[in-house]
Swiss-Prot record:
This is Tyrosine-protein phosphatase 1. The gene is ptp-1. It is found in: Cytoplasm, Cytoskeleton. Residues 29-315 form the FERM domain. It is an enzyme of class 3 (hydrolase). GO terms for molecular function: cytoskeletal protein binding; protein tyrosine phosphatase activity.
């Protein structure tokens, strides 16, 4: 019998057919890890497991080999209102660190490698790329608009593919979701699209590599930032990274303390102290910073210890033994150092095949747990896969406060053992740490279909026990603990991890099986060789190597009848991770190839035998001028092997894959043995390759790393202002000049003069260079990295081609005499910028041009001949130039020009002084003739207040040498002390990179002393009685 009422259980009905949420066994806990692509995955571990167990599971899940650069971060739960970001300590119990569930962690890069080229494994590079891109999107890696547009163009190239008009809207859509900053101009997407067109042909790995190489030059790259206040109660940000400690105020870097100068790090409650050695190497200065809380202060101190130990030491120091009474923190980083990581990679066996599928991160506008202080701890509780961002998201208004700086090359041959304590000072002792750039892998050959079994096999191996150790007791630490450390402090433990299902990956659905071509972003791959090229996709495996390509790029290459870019084979057993490439396909346009590290003469030696597996074949085509872009030295007639002595930036040799590097030994040229050839014969063979049987392609068989096993470390430009020794204020004014020159002589003898020079910034922080990078102005720059500051650039008023010229005003003031020497420092004119050059000379009323280069040097055009022959007239726009005098001596050429404006019929006279005795490479052996030339320039300046134009080829090297020499001469005549480093700093505040090399700086310092001691320059009578 039915009654008139009933019920319907909604909850029970919906639960029918659903898979119940699995709960971990009682003796296990579930940890949720969010990866850099915003996907999450659940890992189950034993309750009492150490952090290393979870780390190893994550590393094996992501198939990461170079593990030491990464870590897991979580939000610390405590009684304070402020949230704290902490790194998971591998050596401690996980539950004790995170207190209570949910155990939600985030996979992040912990140690940012200074040179992305050191990352051998592509999986590692991709994780770095995702991390740096995320930092950029979220405002934690500020840069100017030009740099942001360039980096964004590489992102689009890597994730969308080659630029096409029909996909231009896709590029704009991609950028709108990935880079959302309210301060960007409306035409930002168009600027990115213009740069995107220059990257046609770059495969994802090449675009990502270029992205990382440009990003690492940003000042806040790799910085772990903590808020604080300085002694003047100004809000500051303290960044800790691979190069040392940087201090920022309102987005501007105020100071930098390199690890080599730091003697001690300590903290007490909210006070963080840095003991820094002064330039004299004897005295020390204590820098005190106040941090927001005592806990954050301790985290900052720990971060400094970890960064210093990882990047500067060979092995971590031993943990001090516990005593009866312990005071101060005993924290020490016990993980593996970068040196150990590189050494292990060098001895690791070569890897086999591994399919690689990229995926786009989810939209960055969804803010995460770490986006602000108002976030509650509950917001970090996740039960399902979700979207999140990285910790510490600053306001987007800080984006344009930073400026992109070029990386300064610091040649370091030693690392320091740094003393850490909570209450005392300690001395830093040097340790030799040669870093080898060669790294390989030890994976067995397999395909993606066998990846789960591979993971299980790898997990059975010993897991390296790395992490941090801190005793419960607190005590200070003495420097001998690190200085006498000899053991690596690495322990082995066995990690037992369950096999991971092949259907679940951190990239979710984007990590598809090998048989499904993944072409959603303009790239397609497949595991088997295609029988034809109609699919616009090629196999990622060619002769046992990994290869990926853009379908569009392949089709275009095939249409031209040229080898497609994806057929560039990457041999994982080669020291270069590659065996052959075509330079014309390696890169296009901006950022074609990452710059290499400088190498010292000591690195050109090898004591170890080199096997046959280290022989690499490089293929390259000449540029449109018929040049390959490299020089060699040696030969049978010189009893020296043929070694690559120079590789020009942006040349074919620089862009080819693998890149040709300085120090490589050339064994064969187009199959011919060069061991018995003379130097001239070798050069002839290289030049003849342009018309050889290979269709103009040069084949070099080289032995890399033989003469440069110890690759030196790149560090970004230091804006810490070095302060060399100065004359004391108590010294009478009449003696300050002689005392300052004596200090200069002592610095030259000790070599400190070079150290001071290399510490000085190359480009002034905060000075923008946006005008020179506009599309209309790119062709007006002789070298793409030599650009004028926007604030001090010379602006043309009546030039048909626009107001831009690569030139800066440089004014050098002599305080006591009231003299201001005015210069216009510019690059050597190009053929199509000669008219602009003469317009500048006319508009600035210049009467003297100083030229410090010849037209060609070693067969290369250094400057266009922008003047007519003697008694001839040449038209440059509205200006008529006539050479009325041409006199040449052994060291100089003197010319006089008549310039007439056709519109106004006004005529002027301009003198050109060309110094031709400067050698093609290096500096003159004897400064005598150069001193005489500078004296003649000073005489030509007398009685004139108008600027003189000074140029060489780039307008920074020899140009800076002359400006410094003349300024020093004026200071000597005014009886003022001479500090060359201060002069260079003033010069670089007006034009970047003036005086380009340490050799040039040393030469001009020696010239100053030589001119003073010879009496060429001396104090004038009216100033000598001060």
């Amino acid at each position: 019998m039915r009654l008139g009422s009933n019920s319907y259980d909604v909850q029970r009905t919906e639960a029918i057919g659903q898979t119940p949420v699995k709960t971990p066994p009682p003796n296990q806990i579930r940890c949720t890890v969010t990866f850099l692509d915003s996907t999450s995955y659940h890992f189950e571990i034993e309750k009492n497991s150490l952090g290393i167990v979870l780390l190893e599971k994550v590393f094996n899940y992501l198939e990461i080999i170079e593990k030491d650069y990464f870590g897991l971060v979580f939000i610390a739960v405590d009684n304070s209102s402020a949230q704290q970001k902490k790194w998971l300590d591998p050596s401690k119990n996980l539950r004790k660190q995170m207190i209570c569930p949910p155990y939600h962690l985030f996979f992040r890069v912990k140690f940012y490698v200074r040179d992305p080229n050191r990352l051998r494994d592509e999986f590692t590079r991709f994780q770095f790329y995702q991390q740096v891109r995320q930092n950029l999107e979220e405002g934690r890696l500020p840069c100017n608009e030009g740099s942001l547009a360039l980096l964004a163009s590489y992102v689009v190239q890597a994730e969308v593919g080659d630029f096409e008009e029909k996909t231009h809207g896709m590029s704009r859509t991609c950028l709108c979701y990935k880079i959302q900053f309210a301060t960007l101009p409306d035409d930002f997407s168009d600027r990115v699209a213009e740069l995107h067109q220059l990257h046609i042909g770059q495969t994802p790995d090449v675009a990502e590599q270029n992205f990382l190489d440009h990003a690492r030059r940003l000042e806040m790259y790799g910085m772990d930032v903590y808020d604080g206040v300085d002694a003047n109660h100004l809000p500051i940000e303290i960044g800790v990274g691979a190069v040392g400690i940087k201090v920022f105020h309102e987005g501007i870097k105020m100071n930098e303390y390199a690890w080599v100068r730091i003697r001690k790090l300590s903290f007490k409650k909210k006070q963080f102290q840095v003991l820094v050695a002064n330039e004299d190497g004897v005295s020390e200065t204590i820098m005190i910073f106040n941090i927001m809380s005592a806990k954050i202060c301790k985290l900052l101190w720990k971060c400094c210890i970890e960064q210093h130990t990882f990047f500067r030491l060979k092995t971590p120091p031993k943990t001090p033994q516990r005593k009866v009474f312990n005071f101060g923190s005993k924290f020490r980083y016990s993980g593996r150092t970068e040196y150990q990581t590189l050494e292990e990679n060098e001895h690791r066996k070569s890897a086999g095949h591994r399919n690689f599928h990229r995926s786009l991160s989810k939209s960055s506008f969804l803010r995460s747990t770490f986006s602000g202080n108002t976030q509650s701890i509950d917001s970090s509780r996740y039960t399902n896969t979700t979207t999140t961002d990285s910790p510490e998201l600053p306001s987007s208004g800080q984006l344009l406060a930073r400026r992109l700086l070029s990386a300064a090359r610091h040649d370091t041959d030693s690392s320091d053992a740094l003393g850490y304590a909570s209450d005392g000072a300690v001395v830093c002792a040097p340790l030799t740490t040669p870093l080898s750039p060669r790294r390989t892998r030890d994976y067995a050959t397999d395909s993606e279909s066998s990846a789960p079994s591979l993971r299980q096999q790898r997990l059975s191996k010993e897991a390296i026990y790395y992490g941090t150790q801190e005793s419960c007791d607190e005590k200070s630490w003495t420097p001998s603990m690190a200085c006498t450390s000899t053991s690596p402090g690495i322990h082995a433990s066995t990690a037992s991890v369950r096999p991971v299902s092949s259907g679940s990956t951190p990239n979710g659905a984007s990590r598809k099986s090998a048989n499904s071509g993944y072409s959603g972003y303009g790239y397609a791959t497949q595991t088997q060789q295609p029988t034809s090229t109609t699919n616009a996709s090629y196999s990622p495996y060619l002769n046992g190597t990994i290869s990926r390509s853009s379908g569009a790029a392949v089709a275009k290459a095939a249409a031209r009848g040229l080898p497609p870019t994806n057929q560039q084979a990457y041999n994982t057993s080669s020291p270069r991770n590659s065996v052959a490439s075509y330079s014309s396909f390696a890169s296009a346009g901006i950022g074609g190839s990452p710059p290499r590290s400088k190498r010292s003469p000591q690195s050109n030696k090898s004591s170890s035998p080199v096997g046959e597996d280290q022989v690499v074949t490089i293929k390259m085509r000449p540029d449109r001028h018929g040049r390959f872009g490299f020089n060699v030295k040696g030969g049978a007639d010189q009893n020296y092997p043929v070694i690559v002595s120079r590789v020009a930036p942006g040349s074919s040799a620089d862009k080819c894959q693998p890149r040709l590097n300085e120090g490589d030994q050339v064994l064969f040229i187009d199959g011919r043995d060069v061991s018995t050839m003379s130097h001239d014969h070798v050069v002839q063979f290289i030049r003849s390759a342009r018309s050889g049987l290979n269709g103009g392609e040069l084949h070099l068989t080289i032995r890399p790393n033989v003469y440069r096993l110890g690759e030196e470390v790149d560090e970004p430009d230091s804006t810490m202002v070095p302060e060399p020794a100065r004359v004391a204020d108590s010294v009478p004014n009449s003696d300050k000049l002689s005392k300052s020159l004596q200090l200069l002589a002592d610095s030259l003898n000790s070599g400190k003069v070079v150290d001071h020079f290399e510490m000085l910034y190359r480009k002034k922080p905060g000075m923008s260079m946006n005008i020179c990078r506009l599309t209309a102005n790119l062709a007006k720059n002789r070298y793409r990295d030599v650009c004028p500051y926007d604030d001090t650039r010379v602006t043309l008023q009546a030039s048909p081609s626009g107001d831009y010229i690569n030139a800066n005003y440089v004014n050098m003031e002599i305080p006591s005499s009231g003299i201001v020497n005015r210069y216009i420092a510019c690059q050597g004119p190009l053929a199509h910028t000669s008219s602009d050059f003469w317009v500048m000379v006319w508009e600035q009323h210049c009467t003297t041009i100083v030229m410090l280069t010849t037209i060609t040097e070693r067969g290369r055009v250094k400057c266009h001949q922008y003047w007519p022959r003697v008694f001839e007239t040449q038209e440059y726009g509205r200006l008529m130039i006539k050479c009325i005098k041409d006199k040449q001596t052994t060291n100089c050429c003197y010319r006089e020009f008549s310039i007439r404006d056709r519109n106004s019929s006004e005529e002027r006279r301009v003198t050109q002084m060309q110094y031709i005795a400067w050698p093609d490479h290096g500096v003159p052996d004897d400064p005598k003739h150069f001193i005489q030339f500078v004296d003649e320039v000073r005489k030509a300046r007398q009685g004139s207040v108008d600027p003189i134009v000074v140029h060489c080829s780039a307008g920074i090297g020899r140009t800076g040498v002359l400006i410094l020499m003349e300024t020093a001469a004026c200071l000597v005549e005014s009886n003022e002390p001479v500090y060359p480093l201060d002069i260079v700093r003033t010069m670089r505040d007006q034009r970047a990179m003036l005086i380009q090399t340490p050799g040039q700086y040393t030469f001009v310092c020696e010239s100053i002393l030589r001119a003073y001691h010879d009496g060429t320059i001396k104090p004038l009578a009216e100033y000598s009685k001060r």
